[in-house]
């Protein structure tokens, strides 16, 4: 079933501007409370100016441009501005450090980066090091440095025409984005996302939450994540709704923001729900317009009941991952919800539970959750420049192996059991154990290392490192945590460390992690 009808992202925005005109498309609120607002027509003009900016800097169809930004309107301008000229966005997690970010630039062969002043010192070093193809940086902010190879985004954009000056032929099969996601290997994989993927995500996610043009969808999710893009921004714009993007999450400010913007839909991860619940109760707790709260794993029944009772909202569970583009299994507004089920499979997809031999399992038996879609349309196209990884995850017939375990009941409701092997879920971020182990093992005093996830009341899982030191060495906690903080993003830094004389292993030498939790 083709619900996109050959419409690429350039056509989408031109149509939206014509249909909705002066209707509010985007509201952005910064951490300082500064609000910027754009209609559909004015947002399309900002997107066109940004597309022309990229063209003036030599970007053409198929070129890759990286964005390292916190939530801001410029992210939206760049995302769709690049798509309009057939270029490819490479969003970088705003919390990554230099080595991690440089690897993505190198792997995706990015020559142009858009970032903000706060991240510039890191990229100045990368630029001067000449270890990546990066040759130009476009900066957002005030008091910009007068360095070679650096330009001022706002000044350049303001000079551009609001009419698109470069319109190469586009297909819905063209790549719009390469989104690097943590995997079970030591390095992230680039998930290739097409124009069709994004257009489909808009229609699908709007259907999932019955979104209309009088809805207001508010999110605090980071724009560089798939959930912000494909379960919030794309459905909001596709339905002609108003999209409210907050720069950062604040438990103290959240409900005031919900009321201020009269949000009807929002999305939460467990960490948000837990921090909202520890805020002092107020008479205004139920005074809002929310009809749905999109929710992503993992929460106990007691936590769910306490949250819904206190705030008078319903949680709409959705299960997916970057590779599935959207929440391919989930609740639906009009359906009965069967907690702790993650819901039923959505339209355009099939789902099965399979055993270790890739055979379908009957209801009630636990196995791997496998999803069938169309690569490049309803699921990701491929892993960028990694054909072996693509073949390992994606069967020729379109079946995607998620690596997650679960089961389904007789009525077709699915239940999530466990996370991907070697992955830790920490406050909405996926952290690769192997990646951390490789970084920490570089410490000269450490002989052996393994990291595991342990239960955390707020952030789902905390990270604990078990280490074996070289003979005769000592290592303080301060020294260990300082090393980690200097070599990885903050959200990847372990919360705990324990020194051991050895690590439990099986007969093949593999560490038995269950003996360490």
Swiss-Prot record:
Coiled-coil portions: none
Origin superkingdom: Bacteria
GO biological process, one term: carnitine metabolic process
EC number: 6.2.1.48
Disulfide bridge partners, by residue number: none
Pathway: Amine and polyamine metabolism; carnitine metabolism
Reaction equation(s) it catalyzes: 4-(trimethylamino)butanoate + ATP + CoA = 4-(trimethylamino)butanoyl-CoA + AMP + diphosphate; crotonobetaine + ATP + CoA = crotonobetainyl-CoA + AMP + diphosphate; (R)-carnitine + ATP + CoA = (R)-carnitinyl-CoA + AMP + diphosphate
Nuclease recorded as keyword: no
Keyword Signal: no
Keywords of this entry: Ligase
Enzyme class at the top of the EC tree: ligase
GO molecular function terms noted in the UniProt entry: carnitine-CoA ligase activity; crotonobetaine-CoA ligase activity; medium-chain fatty acid-CoA ligase activity
Pfam families the UniProt entry points to: AMP-binding (PF00501), AMP-binding_C (PF13193)
HAMAP family hit by this protein: CaiC
Function: Catalyzes the transfer of CoA to carnitine, generating the initial carnitinyl-CoA needed for the CaiB reaction cycle. Also has activity toward crotonobetaine and gamma-butyrobetaine.
Similarity-based family: Belongs to the ATP-dependent AMP-binding enzyme family.
Protein's name according to its UniProt entry: Crotonobetaine/carnitine--CoA ligase
Species this protein is from: Salmonella paratyphi C (strain RKS4594)
């Amino acid at each position: 079933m083709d619900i996109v009808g050959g419409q690429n992202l350039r056509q989408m925005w031109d149509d939206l501007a014509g249909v909705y005109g002066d209707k509010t498309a985007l509201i952005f609120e910064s951490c300082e409370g500064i609000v910027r607002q754009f209609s559909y027509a004015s947002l399309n003009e900002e997107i066109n100016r940004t597309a022309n900016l990229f063209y003036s800097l030599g970007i053409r169809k198929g070129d890759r441009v990286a964005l390292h930004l916190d939530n801001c309107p410029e992210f939206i301008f760049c995302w769709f501005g690049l798509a309009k000229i057939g270029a490819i966005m490479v969003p970088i997690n705003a919390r990554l450090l230099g080595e991690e970010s440089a690897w993505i630039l190198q792997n995706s062969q990015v020559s142009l980066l858009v970032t903000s002043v706060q991240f510039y010192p890191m990229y100045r070093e990368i630029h001067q090091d000449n270890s990546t193809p990066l040759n130009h940086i476009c900066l957002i902010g005030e008091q910009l440095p007068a360095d070679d190879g650096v330009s001022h985004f706002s000044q350049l954009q303001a000079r551009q025409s609001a009419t698109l000056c470069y319109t190469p032929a586009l297909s819905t099969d063209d790549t719009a984005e390469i989104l690097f996601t943590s995997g079970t290997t030591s390095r992230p994989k680039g998930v290739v996302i097409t124009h069709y993927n994004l257009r489909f995500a808009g229609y699908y996610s709007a259907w999932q939450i019955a979104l209309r043009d009088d809805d207001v969808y508010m999110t605090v999710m980071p724009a560089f994540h798939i959930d912000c893009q494909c379960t919030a921004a794309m459905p909001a714009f596709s339905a002609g709704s108003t999209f409210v993007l907050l720069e950062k999450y604040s438990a103290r400010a959240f409900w005031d923001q919900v009321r201020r913007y009269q949000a009807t839909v929002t999305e939460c991860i467990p960490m948000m729900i837990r921090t909202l619940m520890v805020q002092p109760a107020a008479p205004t707790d139920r005074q809002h317009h929310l009809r749905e709260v999109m929710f992503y794993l993992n929460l106990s029944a007691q936590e769910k009941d306490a949250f819904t009772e206190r705030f008078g909202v319903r949680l709409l569970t959705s299960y997916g991952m970057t590779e599935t583009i959207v929440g391919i299994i989930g609740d639906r507004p009009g359906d009965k919800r069967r907690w702790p089920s993650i819901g039923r499979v959505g339209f355009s997809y099939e789902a099965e539970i399979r055993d270790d031999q890739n055979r379908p399992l009957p209801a009630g038996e636990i196995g791997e959750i496998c999803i069938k879609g169309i690569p490049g349309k309803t699921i990701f196209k491929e892993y960028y420049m990694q054909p072996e990884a693509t073949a390992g995850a994606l069967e020729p017939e379109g079946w995607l192996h998620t690596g997650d375990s679960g089961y389904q009941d007789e009525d077709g409701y699915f239940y999530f059991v466990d996370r991907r092997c070697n992955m830790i879920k920490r406050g909405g971020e996926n952290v690769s154990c192997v990646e951390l182990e490789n970084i920490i093992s570089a410490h000269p005093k450490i002989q052996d290392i393994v990291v595991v996830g342990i239960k955390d009341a707020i952030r789902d899982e905390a990270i604990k490192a078990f280490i074996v030191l070289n003979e005769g060495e000592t290592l303080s906690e301060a020294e260990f945590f300082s090393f980690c903080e200097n070599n990885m993003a903050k959200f990847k830094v372990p919360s705990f460390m324990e020194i051991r004389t050895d690590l439990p292993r099986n007969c093949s030498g593999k560490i038995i992690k269950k003996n360490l939790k």
